[in-house]
């Protein structure tokens, strides 16, 4: 992206502004809200961007004929006008309820340097001049919308630029030329500058800011099974105190996307304003992910002998399994075993103040591998456990880790007689804690991507667990390139 007014709005606007409730009965699955502090930061970044753009303004030459009593007739030209310096001092970015944002800049100045030349008969004079443009004020409305792909849009409207005073210094001590400038050039140049400033803002919004907002992802990959839909539910909404934008935050199977039957619940955000932006992620997003994993069979697992550590005191064959069920070796001598774990239903993430937990229910079925390679079921067990989750937010992702309690095992069915449930429970807990959960945590460490546009980082993170949603406050930094 070119250096432009991109940081102005995109610093925050592109930063996933979501709202508390969507339109048409559709609620967002992820929520963020921008505060006055966030808008103030955007305005500050906007000044830096606008100052860079002001230097790119090209000014026309001014020429014509003159007739001055003491001098006579001749031709003049003020040319090679360039902006040498500019200082934008006061800025504010305010909410424009129902439309978007209003940017105002005041008490600013611009310095212009150029050359002049005069021709009268065979006489030619030339020199330079400096122009101090004082009391510059700029105001423009930034209207927010949504395109068909679900990305935010922005357009400039009602731009106004005003100049309070122009102070010119002309080399050569030619007072009549100074008077000529005031009489014939000053008002024209003032109007040109005012128009050029608004043209620059319009161009920057169209060429820099709008394309930058298009870098906001509509979908993002979570892993080889899951994706997340970050398209807008409705156009960004400016309210009296906050700027809200609504994203679906809908998890889907990347290989087979189907409509989500369960509507997204409504979230109620607290009225916080200490940080620039606040995010909320509904437990809906995590529970849809759990459902997709379950439907895809991703939560099921199998345990074979080659998956056990080499130094394990227990092997998955009928001889080593005699302490669990003595009859198995008599009925199936010297045969291998396989354990197949199935999650009965998609685990539900319980989100309550200060707590994240789930209670998956599983069944584990034991199979004997016959000499024909066929599998014959010999026992079936029910397993329940409580798992606590911890989440970590960095500047672009949400990562997680599971902390399981001990699994509780019960016998559902045995085709090989007596079964030592307590001994199997100890074996299963050893495997889960040392093999299965570390693998799951390695996957969770890959992270849940936040819908951030380019060059945006979050810091000063404050994470809270609320009822039915996760809540994150953050400050924002735009990384200039």
Swiss-Prot record:
Source species: Mus musculus
One of the Pfam families matching this protein, by short name: LBP_BPI_CETP
Family matches, as Gene3D superfamilies: Bactericidal permeability-increasing protein, domain 1, Bactericidal permeability-increasing protein, domain 2
InterPro entries cross-referenced by the UniProt entry: Bactericidal_perm-incr_a/b_dom (IPR017943), BPI/LBP (IPR030675), BPI/LBP/Plunc (IPR032942), Lipid-bd_serum_glycop_C (IPR001124), Lipid-bd_serum_glycop_CS (IPR017954), Lipid-bd_serum_glycop_N (IPR017942)
Location(s) in or outside the cell: Secreted; Cytoplasmic granule membrane
Cellular component GO terms, alphabetical: cell surface; extracellular space; membrane
CDD domains: BPI1 (cd00025), BPI2 (cd00026)
GO molecular function: coreceptor activity; lipopeptide binding; lipopolysaccharide binding; lipoteichoic acid binding; signaling receptor binding
Protein name: Lipopolysaccharide-binding protein
Protein function: Plays a role in the innate immune response. Binds to the lipid A moiety of bacterial lipopolysaccharides (LPS), a glycolipid present in the outer membrane of all Gram-negative bacteria. Acts as an affinity enhancer for CD14, facilitating its association with LPS. Promotes the release of cytokines in response to bacterial lipopolysaccharide.
Residues linked to a glycan: 300, 355
Major location (coarse): secreted
Cleavable signal peptide: 1-24
Alphabetical UniProt keywords: Antibiotic, Antimicrobial, Disulfide bond, Glycoprotein, Immunity, Innate immunity, Lipid transport, Membrane, Secreted, Signal, Transport
Signal keyword on record: yes
SMART domains, per database record: BPI1, BPI2
Family: Belongs to the BPI/LBP/Plunc superfamily. BPI/LBP family.
Domain of life: Eukaryota
SUPFAM superfamilies: Bactericidal permeability-increasing protein, BPI
Assembly mode: When bound to LPS, interacts (via C-terminus) with soluble and membrane-bound CD14.
GO process annotations (BP): acute-phase response; cell surface pattern recognition receptor signaling pathway; cellular response to lipopolysaccharide; cellular response to lipoteichoic acid; defense response to Gram-negative bacterium; defense response to Gram-positive bacterium; detection of molecule of bacterial origin; innate immune response
Disulfide bridge positions per record: 159-198
